[in-house]
Amino acid sequence: MKNRARRVIFSICTYTLLLLGLVGQIIIGGSNLQGETLKKEKTEASFQDIWSGEWQSNFENYLTDRLKIREWLIPIRNQIMYSLFKTSPNGNIIIGKNGNLYEEEYICFETQIYPPMTEDEINILVEKLTVLDKSLKDKEKKLFIFITPSKAEIYSEDIPVRYLKIAPDEKLPSTYNLFIEALNQTDIAYYDSTQDVRNLKQTSEFHVFPRTGTHWSKVTAAICAQELSDSMEKQLGIELPECKVKYQKCKEPLHPDSDIYNLLNLLEKPDEIFYEPIIEITDTCKEDYTILARGGSFMGSSLNRLIQNDYFARSYYMENTFAVCPEGVYSGNFDTYDSLPIQEMIEDSDIIFLEVNEEAISRMSFGFIDYLLENDILELP
């Protein structure tokens, strides 16, 4: 009787799961999964692949990826890993102390698991910037550098202990400190938002970097955008609009405040209080300057906010591998700088703006500086 009861229970569970899978396959809509959930593409069969078993394996993955119940099972599995075992289901996202999430790369640079740049390497970079600055000044143009902070530096106290154990005990001078020291020996105009963010962390009611994001919060970015504008006015001798930044709580996170939390594909909503900036333009007086900006994702919620509020007459905006230019020039993804009319963009611009995160100084501007110097782009008519 016991064996029969077990078989009945097993059969009921099996058929229930099959029924749920069938119902899920019918009623579940498009995928809402994010991050590492790319589906396998169907591959053509060849005799060699069939003989080796590779085609069968690929076809099995192809069918598995298209089971719509997968969209239920992945968040359930991920939530169990995250809540019960405090384990990240995404290998690139690290769960720190106090539930603070990090991208591993930022931790490795901050702890010097990845060694910092040497003083000679920094000097070579700053020498290139000095040459660029002089060349632009000769053409009556202006160079401005914008330095943005790393979450792993601002919230270093929440880095997991296991990274501190494998980091070197004796720290070398950091890339960031060497870079600032070298810049201070030049006449290059720059705004370092890192110290302002450190100070804001001590006084604000919100997290300057949300626990759920890898970037600074929308409010932090707006406050630093205001400081950036003031710094550009003072150092470049130009006039830009003035604004005041306030903030209020919001029910849902604004991008990018939960960007890496979303990549975990969990069932629960993030346990974080989110805020949204309220920006009031108090003075619209400005001079008609055209800006060419090159940088990474931290630029998207800071400088781009100034651009969207018409701080500049025109803008050529290059963030990572995406460019937004005036109508008729170019907008979209680009693989190389040769895809863009860089010479014409430089010629039309008054300000060349370079953003760099303190973690990314070693790859500053994604080769843009070298491209300008090595291709005689600054030899304008």
Regions from the PLM with identified roles:
Residues 1-381:
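Extracellular glycan-modifying ectodomains
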